[in-house]
From Swiss-Prot:
The protein, known as: LexA repressor
Function as written in the Swiss-Prot or TrEMBL entry: Represses a number of genes involved in the response to DNA damage (SOS response), including recA and lexA. In the presence of single-stranded DNA, RecA interacts with LexA causing an autocatalytic cleavage which disrupts the DNA-binding part of LexA, leading to derepression of the SOS regulon and eventually DNA repair.
UniProt family annotation: Belongs to the peptidase S24 family.
First-level EC class: hydrolase
Superkingdom: Bacteria
Alphabetical list of Gene3D superfamilies matching this protein: Umud Fragment, subunit A, Winged helix-like DNA-binding domain superfamily/Winged helix DNA-binding domain
One annotated GO biological process: negative regulation of DNA-templated transcription
The entry's DNA-binding region: 28-48
Length: 206
C-alpha cells in the first residue's frame, strides 16, 4: 500500500466511523482535521480517487453527501452481514409451529458479539419458556449449529418439520425438548434436528 493509498484508506475509515457515530457523513474540513491534512483540495483529490475506484459516491452540490459503497465497506471489512443479523421469522415457545424464513429485516449486531456470522434472529410466540426469561413477543439471537449439549436452549425442528424453542436433552433412546413452564409437558422425539443454539435475547420495552 502506497502512502497515498494509506491516506485514502484512513479517510474511508474516518467517513465510516463518523457515519456510525453521528448518523451522517463528515464535511471535507472535518476529514482534514481527522487525518492530519491542512488542505481541503488535497482531501478533495483523495475523495475523487476513492470515487473513481468505486469506494464512495458523492453529490458535489451538497457538503455532506458522501456515501460508502458496498465495495468500500468490503475494503473496510464492514459489509452489512458482518454487523447485522437477519430476522428470519417466528418460532413458537409453546406448541411447535413452522418457522417462516422470510429474511425480511435486519437487526444491529449487539456489541458483545464479535461477528454476525452464523447468527440469525427469530421472534418468539408462546409462553413455554417464561421460566427462562423468554417471553411471548421476545426476539432471540440464534447461532446456527447442528448439535447441542444437554440443558442448552435451542431452536429445534421436530419430525413434522415444525420449529420450536425449548431446552434440549438427549436421553437414552430419545430426545426431550423441555419447556420452561411448569404447566407444560416436554416434547419427546425419536429424531430431532437442531437448527441453532439461543445465545441472546432482545425485548422491546416501548
Amino acid at each position: 500500500m502506497t502512502k497515498s493509498e494509506k491516506r485514502q484508506h484512513d479517510i474511508l475509515r474516518y467517513i465510516f466511523s463518523h457515519v456510525s457515530d453521528s448518523g451522517y457523513p463528515p464535511t471535507v474540513r472535518e476529514i482534514c482535521n481527522a487525518v492530519g491534512l491542512s488542505s481541503t483540495s488535497t482531501v478533495h483529490g483523495h475523495l475523487s480517487k476513492l470515487e473513481s475506484k468505486g469506494l464512495i459516491k458523492r453529490d458535489p452540490t451538497k457538503p455532506r453527501a458522501i456515501e460508502i459503497t458496498l465495495a468500500g465497506l468490503e475494503m473496510l471489512d464492514e459489509l452489512p452481514n458482518k454487523t447485522q443479523i437477519p430476522i428470519v421469522g417466528t418460532v413458537t415457545a409453546g406448541e411447535p409451529i413452522l418457522a417462516v424464513e422470510e429474511n425480511r429485516d435486519y437487526f444491529p449486531l449487539p456489541p458483545y458479539f464479535e461477528s454476525a456470522d452464523d447468527l440469525f434472529m427469530l421472534s418468539i410466540r408462546g409462553e413455554s419458556m417464561i421460566n427462562a426469561g423468554i417471553l411471548d413477543g421476545d426476539q432471540v439471537i440464534v447461532r446456527k449449529q447442528s448439535s447441542a449439549n444437554n440443558g442448552e436452549i435451542v431452536i429445534a425442528m421436530t419430525e413434522e418439520n415444525e420449529a420450536t424453542c425449548k431446552r434440549f436433552f438427549k436421553e437414552d433412546g430419545y430426545y426431550r425438548l423441555q419447556p420452561e413452564n411448569d404447566t407444560m409437558d416436554p416434547i419427546i422425539l425419536e429424531n430431532v434436528t437442531i437448527l441453532g443454539k439461543v445465545v441472546g435475547l432482545y425485548r422491546d420495552l416501548i
